[in-house]
Amino acid sequence: MANAYGFVGHSVPTMKRAAQFQQMGSGFCSADSISKRVFCCSVVQGADKPASGDSRTEYRTPRLVSRGCKLVGSGSAMPALQVSNDDLSKIVDTNDEWISVRTGIRNRRVLTGKESLTNLATVAARKALEMAQVDANDVDMVLMCTSTPEDLFGSAPQIQKALGCKKNPLAYDITAACSGFVLGLVSAACHIRGGGFNNILVIGADSLSRYVDWTDRGTCILFGDAAGAVLVQSCDAEEDGLFAFDLHSDGDGQRHLKAAITENGIDHAVGSNGSVSDFPPRSSSYSCIQMNGKEVFRFACRCVPQSIESALGKAGLNGSNIDWLLLHQANQRIIDAVATRLEVPQERVISNLANYGNTSAASIPLALDEAVRGGKVKAGHLIATAGFGAGLTWGSAIVRWG
C-alpha cells in the first residue's frame, strides 16, 4: 500500500528496535540506523482507466513499480595552477619531507583570479554527461555539494544554466563539507527511488584555498581546489547500484574543525538617544579554517571504519566482497588506518591525495573519475566509499559502478 510520499509500505523494512545511541570515549556519539536496502516506487505513466462496467467515475490509483539507481558517468576538473610542497616552503616554515611524511600530499591545485569554481563544476558535469551519453536536456536535477559556493544563495542554478538545461530542472546546493558528496549520492538515490527523477548530476566541488590562512603551516599544506561529478540514473530495482548507506553527524565536534562567521567593521549607531543599539548589524564574513588536527585524525580513524562496517552489514557484505575502498582524500595516514581496520589490501585502495591534497567534497568524485578513466574501476565493481569532516559529519555508501 502506497503512502502519501509514494513509498510502498510492505517493501519498506520496519525497525525492529529503536535506534540505540552510545557515547564514545572522546564524547562523540554513534547510532544504529535503519537496516537493509529500501526500494521506493514511483508512478508509471499515469493511471489506468476503469474497466468496462466499473461504477467508479475516477481513474484507478496509478500503478507503482520498484526503482533503483546506478552510477553511469563521471567527470572531473581542476585549476591550472599547481602548488608543490617546495613552493609552500618559500612562504611558511616547512619542507617537502615534513609535509609528505605527515600527510602524503606533494602537490595541490589552486584557483586563481582567472578561474571560477562554478566553471570547474560545469566542466566536470559535462564530462560526466559525455561518458554517460546523456544530453543536458535530459537532466532533471543538479545537486552541487560544496561548502564554498560563489554565491551566498548557492551555485547549482548557475551550473544548470551553464550546462544549457532547457527544461529548468531543479538545482540546489548541499553543504556538508568533506562528507558532501556521499550525502549527495544518497539524496540522488532518494529522489530517484521515491520522486520519479531519472538523471541526476551529483557534483562535488570546493575551493577551500580561499579560506586558508597561508601563514599557518598546519592547515595551508592540506587543501586544494577541484571539482568532480557523477551522473546517477534511474534503473530497474534489480539493477540498483546503491546497496546501503550509513550517515551521521555530531555537532559537539564542531570545535575541532570550523570556519565560523566573523563580524567586520564597526557598530553603526542609529540615532543618539540610545533607543536603538547594535543596528544596523555589522557586515560579516567567514574566518579561515581552524582545525585541531589530532582530534580530527582520531575521529576519522574511529568513526569511518565503523560507518563502512555498518553499511556493509546492511548490504549483507563484508570487506572481502568489495573491489575498491575509496575514502575522502584527507590524509594518507587516515586512509591507511581505515584500510588496515577493514583488512583491505593497499592494491584495492584508491588514492590520488599526493597530487591534489584535500579537495573536500570534490575528493571522492575526482578520485573515482581518474580511476574509471584509468581503467582501474570497471563496470560491475563494488566500491565502499566514505566521507568525513566538518560538522562533524561522516557517512559511507556501498555502490556499484555502471
UniProtKB/Swiss-Prot annotation:
HAMAP family on file: FabH
InterPro entries: ACP_syn_III_C, ACP_syn_III_N, FabH, Thiolase-like
Keywords in alphabetical order: Chloroplast, Fatty acid biosynthesis, Fatty acid metabolism, Lipid biosynthesis, Lipid metabolism, Plastid, Transferase, Transit peptide
GO cellular component assignments: chloroplast
Annotated pathway: Lipid metabolism; fatty acid biosynthesis
Family: Belongs to the thiolase-like superfamily. FabH family.
Location of this chain's protein in the cell: Plastid, Chloroplast
GO BP: any one term: fatty acid biosynthetic process
Record flagged with keyword Ligase: no
The EC number(s) this enzyme carries: 2.3.1.180
Keyword Protease found: no
Catalytic activity: malonyl-[ACP] + acetyl-CoA + H(+) = 3-oxobutanoyl-[ACP] + CO2 + CoA
Gene3D superfamilies named in the record: 3.40.47.10
Cited function: Catalyzes the condensation reaction of fatty acid synthesis by the addition to an acyl acceptor of two carbons from malonyl-ACP. KAS III catalyzes the first condensation reaction which initiates fatty acid synthesis and may therefore play a role in governing the total rate of fatty acid production. Possesses both acetoacetyl-ACP synthase and acetyl transacylase activities.
One GO MF term: beta-ketoacyl-acyl-carrier-protein synthase III activity
Protein name (database record): Beta-ketoacyl-[acyl-carrier-protein] synthase III B, chloroplastic
Domain of life per record: Eukaryota
Enzyme class: transferase
Classification via PANTHER family: 3-OXOACYL-[ACYL-CARRIER-PROTEIN] SYNTHASE (PTHR43091), BETA-KETOACYL-[ACYL-CARRIER-PROTEIN] SYNTHASE III, CHLOROPLASTIC (PTHR43091:SF1)
Active site feature: C178, H328, N358
Gene encoding the protein: KAS3B
Biological source species: Cuphea wrightii (Wright's waxweed)
